[in-house]
Amino acid sequence: MEFDPTKINISSIDHVTILQYIDEPNDIRLTVCIIQNINNITYYINITKINPHLANQFRTWKKRIAGRDYMTNLSRDTGIQQSKLTETIRNCQKNRNIYGLYIHYNLVINVVIDWITDVIVQSILRGLVNWYIANNNYTPNTPNNTTTISELDIIKILDKYEEVYRVSKEKECGICYEVVYSKRLENDRYFGLLDSCNHIFCITCINIWHRTRRETGASDNCPICRTRFRNITMSKFYKLVN
């Protein structure tokens, strides 16, 4: 089932945008609350409203090594303090439609979305978030700002993510030679991207390599091409998507 932008209803309460995706023939109703952080030009998504269990899973994941490493790398890459990568709106009468745990959209697209067992909801959530970001990053070239991003632009953006995801599913780690997405442990199903080259590694193997090199006093070189690297970025995809 494909994401359909015509099924979106948009409303807002205070500084929160509420997106409702309603597909009655297929019995799908998904509500996504989004906060735009003007200072950092980024977005925070309410995972409590998507599914209350996701918030508890996220808090548990964040305490694990993979979660701590991911949060550290995301903070470094975005320039946002770790404590500012999440926001909470309290549950009270005034906030009953928007309360919950809001997390940086990167965490939703690359981490939390994999905890949703319904693949159709996964696909629609990814499309909904990317659609919203595409619309809000688009600057209309009209005096009254009435033009919105075209259907073709939306399709191109979604196609890019789907293509990267499709290719990522087949990629093998250059150290253990296992398909990254097929690894037994969920925390191992991430790529470790080097800033020096495009060789593919799972996050676990490249972190072990990095730690061993440091412990022995060796330089941080790619295990394959030996090009020196400075940073390892944890990612759900085999390459960064711009």
From Swiss-Prot:
SUPFAM superfamilies named among the record's database cross-references: RING/U-box
Annotated keywords: Host cytoplasm, Host-virus interaction, Metal-binding, Modulation of host cell apoptosis by virus, Modulation of host ubiquitin pathway by viral E3 ligase, Modulation of host ubiquitin pathway by virus, Transferase, Ubl conjugation pathway, Zinc, Zinc-finger
Q: Where are the zinc fingers (RING-type)?
A: 173-226
Under the heading Gene3D superfamilies, the entry gives: Zinc/RING finger domain, C3HC4 (zinc finger)
| Listed GO biological process terms | protein polyubiquitination; symbiont-mediated perturbation of host apoptosis; symbiont-mediated perturbation of host ubiquitin-like protein modification
Which reactions does this protein catalyse?
A: S-ubiquitinyl-[E2 ubiquitin-conjugating enzyme]-L-cysteine + [acceptor protein]-L-lysine = [E2 ubiquitin-conjugating enzyme]-L-cysteine + N(6)-ubiquitinyl-[acceptor protein]-L-lysine
Residue ranges of every copy of the KilA-N domain listed in the record:
21-131
Role according to the record: RING-finger E3 ubiquitin ligase which catalyzes the formation of both 'Lys-48'- and 'Lys-63'-linked polyubiquitin chains. Plays an important role in virulence by acting as an anti-apoptotic factor.
Protein name per Swiss-Prot or TrEMBL: Host range factor p28
Instruction: Say which species the protein is native to.
Output: Cowpox virus (strain Brighton Red) (CPV)
